[in-house]
Amino acid sequence: MGVDMGELRGAHVPVLLERCLELLAPALGRAGRTVYVDATLGLGGHAEAVLATHPQTMLVGLDRDTEALAHARVRLARFADRVHLEHAVYDELPDVLDRLGHPVVDGILFDLGVSSLQLDAPDRGFAYAQDAPLDMRMDQTRGLTAEEVVNTYPHPDLARVLRVYGEEKFAPRIASAIVRERERDPITSSARLAELVRQTIPAPARRTGGHPAKRTFQALRIEVNRELAALETALPAALDRLTIEGRLVVLSYHSLEDRLTKVALADRVRSKGPVDLPVELPGTGPTFRLLSRGAELPGEAEVAMNPRAASVRLRAAERLDPTAEQRRRTDRERYRRRVRAMHQPGTGSAVRRPTPGDDGTGTDEEGEGHDS
């Protein structure tokens, strides 16, 4: 079922909305009440579309940003009897679900990274294109600010943050420039930091790869909000909470997020049993199957409609019925072994020739017809 974007309220355009709805539909469209978790609610665009599409679905929405929660609450007011919003980070998901009495859920969405609200807010410090205090906290009620990181981290720690979280090859040079500059005067604004980074990076590198400060700002944001540490905890916990045939969809916006997602899913889709056994041992088979071939990328139309979708990578998976999957894998393995045995030297041809007096119409003990 498609969603008319004109019917969705507000100017915010959810990323890959139709694809997310398509992937979640089999899990959320089942008979009876279903539970959908939006682990990164933001402005509520994906949640609004899910609730409009699935009248029996209950929403549990999490966000660490109190301002985003306030906007989403207004946006989702017409679904109020099916909505429960929580001020929480996604690695707190198990605690939230336990408190609400949901041991398992049917669908979960992670739309990672910084939200449109945070990018567009002139006073939050996320954007290098406008001057603002160096805050960068998604939850402005707690935690270190980017200003504190920039002005207090020793050089080795600052360089590590820029190298690991920003994948910035000039990390040591930028860290040195920051340390020198802050000794003269604390760095308190996004514009000053962005200009310092621009001046520090060699001129040829400035002309490629977008804004020179992009990777530095990404690294600081990830450090301030503990994004990767939280995601590393949250993804396995979310997978554990899905019911059989429940589905997880993850939208990531840089390689570090996508890498963590890929690893978390890969761990669940492979067999953990001995490779040389003819049958799958109980408890060793895959517990999920992938719904996407690698990371799905946005199409040209999506990017034209929503430029912020340009860097998105989508991965999705579905929880398997362990009994049914074990039976299918055992049947497939038995079939493969029989085929291999038929072609082993000394076992004869895979095609059985009729013997004298055999009209070729009988069946063997396995119930398979003879070939004439």
UniProtKB/Swiss-Prot annotation:
Q: Which UniProt keywords apply?
A: Cytoplasm, Methyltransferase, rRNA processing, S-adenosyl-L-methionine, Transferase
- UniProt keyword rRNA processing present: yes
Q: Where is this region: Disordered?
A: 315-372
Q: Where is the composition biased (Acidic residues)?
A: 361-372
Which domain of life does this protein belong to? Bacteria
User: What Gene3D superfamilies does the database record attribute to this sequence?
Assistant: Putative methyltransferase TM0872, insert domain (1.10.150.170), Vaccinia Virus protein VP39 (3.40.50.150)
- EC number, UniProt record: 2.1.1.199
Q: Where is the signal peptide?
A: none
Q: Quote any Pfam family the record assigns.
A: Methyltransf_5
What Gene Ontology terms describe where this protein resides (cellular component)? cytoplasm
Which reaction equations make up its catalytic activity? cytidine(1402) in 16S rRNA + S-adenosyl-L-methionine = N(4)-methylcytidine(1402) in 16S rRNA + S-adenosyl-L-homocysteine + H(+)
**Protein's cellular compartments:** Cytoplasm
- What Gene Ontology molecular-function terms does this entry list? rRNA (cytosine-N4-)-methyltransferase activity
GO annotation terms (biological process)? rRNA base methylation
Residues given in the record as S-adenosyl-L-methionine binding sites: 44-46, 63, 97, 111, 118
Q: Where is the composition biased (Basic and acidic residues)?
A: 315-334
Q: What class of enzyme is it?
A: transferase
Q: What family does this belong to? A: Belongs to the methyltransferase superfamily. RsmH family.
- Stated role: Specifically methylates the N4 position of cytidine in position 1402 (C1402) of 16S rRNA.
Full protein name: Ribosomal RNA small subunit methyltransferase H
* Source species taxonomy: Bacteria, Bacillati, Actinomycetota, Actinomycetes, Micromonosporales
